[in-house]
């Protein structure tokens, strides 16, 4: 698909305006242009990709935002294939490491070595959690049996109610931090169950092999967004933050930093929490306004360290680790080649990390890498981190950390159109919520809604 028709100077008149040039917005724009509709995409940043951002460490592409793509993520895989962007398996050969209460030990597989009591308890919790998740309708979680009860408690409260051991609670805390960028007490049990159901289960969500972390894009996931935007050409306007959307009889007037556009419809493809940055006239119904305040982003950052070789492999380690010590709580080996450079990527608890100066962030992250893989990690060729909490647009973590009480009160309005205003973002997806695949699916769904009305 190659679109060549030029976009004129403002004010513009098009069929549809899309707000946001992340995976959701670009997917929506591509679907509509394929059908012959005139589309204009407004993006507030000076780049496309949304929560995908590819930087460099030691000259190697490094995903500062979302990194992984896995089986059953068919929408984003199809998009990458169409655009000619390859994936490569995430390195997983060797022993994993778990750092627990001040000591580190190795294990193989998904579940760390715990005591017999701990393993039995983890198995029990997985069974109970999966049973609850299977009973949650992803498209309408408020209709689940015991929906109100599940939504009124946090994941942390649920773990205490079912008398999880301290080891089990610690493992679930690590999972919660890397998944939503928050603590178990911050996220609704109903949201946690729905999220797992949308991924196809805990194994699919957490595993590398046959799971959500199975593959990555060697040149960075932002390539996918850049290639999609290149096809749309001048229809994508950067540095065009949308400030206001007016509804009227003919559709909408969308006011951005680059000018105004008249359209029959608008697709707002940004995280729900950041809808509040746009002024709507007439105002959105109260339920929509409340939803934006009850769908906060988590807090998650990333740290990379590059070495001459992936030295941990020589000791039989995979580079994957879990830790209950801040700031790095999970790591992956994202080295491009076995002969170097060796690159460790760590997910970081942003709450205490983001406010530190770079020297202290570097020191703390390298200290964590060294406690997992040895003192050689203290002397990298290069170190880079990215603090998502400092972003002007969509700051925070990879997805929403929805607190107790939110789904049953406000979930109905998450993607329900308001006249000509339609909604997209990975948070609104029924499959792979929180992932690029969910974002692509949400954009395609919003495009189908609008196309049916054009």
From Swiss-Prot:
- Supply the EC number(s): 1.4.3.-
| Highest taxon listed in the record's lineage | Bacteria
- GO molecular function: any one? oxidoreductase activity
Q: Which Gene3D superfamilies match?
A: 3.90.660.10, FAD/NAD(P)-binding domain, Guanine Nucleotide Dissociation Inhibitor, domain 1
Keyword line: FAD, Flavoprotein, Oxidoreductase
- Which regions form coiled coils? none
UniProt cross-references to Pfam families, sorted A to Z: Amino_oxidase
Q: What cellular component GO annotations does this protein have?
A: cytosol; plasma membrane
Q: Which cofactor does it need?
A: FAD
Entry keyword annotation includes Oxidoreductase: yes
In which family does this protein belong, per the annotation?
Belongs to the flavin monoamine oxidase family.
Per its record, how is this protein called by name? Answer: Putative flavin-containing monoamine oxidase AofH
Q: From which source organism is this entry?
A: Mycobacterium tuberculosis (strain ATCC 25618 / H37Rv)
């Amino acid at each position: 698909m190659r679109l060549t028709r030029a976009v004129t100077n403002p004010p513009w008149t098009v069929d549809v305006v899309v707000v946001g040039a992340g995976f959701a917005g670009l997917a929506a724009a591509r679907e509509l242009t394929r059908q012959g509709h005139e589309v204009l995409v407004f993006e507030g940043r000076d780049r496309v990709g949304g929560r995908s951002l590819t930087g460099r460490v030691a000259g190697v592409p490094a995903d500062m935002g979302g990194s992984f793509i896995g089986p059953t993520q068919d929408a984003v895989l199809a998009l990458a294939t169409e655009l000619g962007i390859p994936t490569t398996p995430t390195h997983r050969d060797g022993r994993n490491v778990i750092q627990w209460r001040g000591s580190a030990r190795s294990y193989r597989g998904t579940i760390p070595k715990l005591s017999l009591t701990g393993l039995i308890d983890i198995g029990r919790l997985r069974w109970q959690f999966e049973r609850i998740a299977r009973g949650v309708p992803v498209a309408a979680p408020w209709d689940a049996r015991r929906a109100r009860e599940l939504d009124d408690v946090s994941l942390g409260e649920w773990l205490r109610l079912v008398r999880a051991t301290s080891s089990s609670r610690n493992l679930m805390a690590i999972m919660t931090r890397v998944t939503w960028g928050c603590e178990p007490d911050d996220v609704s049990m109903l949201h946690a169950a729905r999220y797992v159901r949308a991924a196809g289960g805990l194994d699919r969500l957490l595993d590398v092999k046959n799971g959500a972390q199975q593959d990555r894009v060697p040149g960075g996931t932002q390539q996918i967004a850049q290639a999609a935007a290149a096809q749309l050409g001048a229809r994508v306007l950067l540095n065009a933050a949308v400030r206001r959307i007016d509804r009227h009889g003919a559709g909408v007037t969308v006011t951005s930093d680059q000018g105004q556009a008249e359209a029959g419809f608008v697709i707002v493809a940004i995280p729900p929490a950041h809808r509040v940055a746009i002024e709507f006239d007439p105002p959105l119904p109260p339920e929509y306004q409340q939803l934006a305040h009850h769908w906060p982003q988590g807090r998650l950052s990333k740290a990379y360290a590059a070495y001459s070789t992936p030295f941990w492999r020589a000791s039989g380690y995979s580079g994957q680790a879990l830790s209950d010590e801040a700031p790095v709580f999970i790591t992956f080996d994202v080295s491009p080649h076995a002969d170097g450079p060796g690159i460790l990527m760590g997910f970081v608890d942003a709450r205490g990390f983001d406010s530190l100066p770079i020297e202290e962030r570097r020191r703390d992250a390298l200290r964590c890498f060294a406690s997992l893989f040895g003192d050689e990690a203290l002397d990298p060729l290069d170190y880079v981190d990215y603090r998502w909490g400092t972003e002007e647009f969509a700051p925070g973590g990879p997805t929403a950390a929805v607190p107790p009480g939110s789904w049953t009160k406000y979930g109905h309005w998450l993607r329900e159109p308001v006249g000509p205003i339609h909604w997209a973002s990975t948070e609104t997806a029924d499959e792979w919520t929180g992932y690029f695949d969910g974002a692509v699916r949400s954009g395609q769904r919003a495009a189908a809604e609008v196309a049916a009305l054009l």
